[in-house]
């Protein structure tokens, strides 16, 4: 089982819901920094996205994370995909935990990573993965 907790009285006081959707060709997704809501850039949208409630999608893929920071000199100043965007994009695009790992890796490779160190716990009914990213 994978879950997510953030022990903060001022952050994460809401439950996120994103419905499943079909997107027209050429649609873009605007990415925002999870901590500051600052726009980071845009990436192409996929043709279909899955429903997400909290940090689990309609296929029971769930993602949690642990921030461990990273060395500042390793951070990618040109990256536009932060850890929060990676979590939601993976949930919207992946039907299994294994697919979520690939979605995250592909997005970071294509668009760069805009956060420090994160450890993602990604599970589905059949398997669980741990993925660490330092940026």
Task: State the predicted function of each range.
Residues 75-77, 85-94:
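Second-shell loop/turn segments in exported
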